Every structure is written in C-alpha cells, then in structure tokens.
C-alpha cells in the first residue's frame, strides 16, 4: 500500500475512507467532501509526499451505491514517482458540491468546468465556473448523468434551434475561441472585438 495512505489516516482520521491498490498501479483513497481542500493541500505541500502534479479531474456515476457519484482526482508525485487517486462520493439526490482545487493547481480550471458541464457538480471557489462543452444556455441537463435520456430531452429541431441561437462572443474568451476551428468562420467585426477583450450580448430566444 502507498505509504501516503497511512499518513493521511493518521492526519485526517475519519475523513479518510476506504483505500486500495488498483490493478493499474495506482492507489485509490476516498475522502469526505468537507475535508477535500485540506487533504489536497496537505498532499501537495507535505515534503515527504508532495503530489505536485494534478493529472486529471473527472467523475463517475454508479447505479448501485448509496452515494453513486464520485469526483475523481488523479495526482502524481514527480519526485517520488508515486500515483494517487483521490475520490469524493456525492449523492445526486442532494447537494452536488465540493471545493474547487483550482486555487491549488491552476490546471484544474477547465477540468472542473467539464465535470460541472457533464455531471452538474458545483466546485465552490472556482474562479469561472460555467459550461465548457455545451453552450451556456443549454437547458437539457447534464449529458453524462445516468438519468439523461439517450436522445436528449428536447426534439432534434429544438436542439438545433437553440444551438444556432447561441452567441459565442458572449460566452467565450478570445483565448478560447482563437484555438477553436470555428474561430475563422466568425464575422470580422466579432473577431476584432474579441481581440480587444470585449464581450457581446446573448441573443434573445424567440
């Protein structure tokens, strides 16, 4: 077992749940949502462990668990060449919220936005929590949740109408749009405003 697990249990007590070594070589440990920020800060800053690299943030939903939704953080200690998978269990029937780790690892920014967009998990303290794959006014819910219908909740024509009604200038920064293939297809005046850092207004729905 990764020695970090024993150190976590000694430091945080009941906030640390089940732990196991996985077949992929990673060690998995469950943490209560209310202590996540403390645990992650400890993992990053404690010299003996120092998980300095955040590999990924994602989520998984299971049907047969009391708290079926897990937010999963994959950490690596580059110095120690150790891997740790930290999991927080949440219940979709209650408040889907956990502290953001973006203040600890800036690379968590878009990863947490994707989990919010696809699963509806709110990351408290995130500097810019909004959808990243679906448009900002997307109203069908969270596409990777188990209760999301295969074909969506709206008709195909309504989905197309809503997508065409989106104003990308209002919802995305110059940085985001400039790396997208569709950027070259935007009107010239819109690209110029984006270069100046301006934002437009969301079009009114008809």
Regions found by a protein language model. Give the residues of each.
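Terminal low-complexity/charged segments
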Residues: 1-206
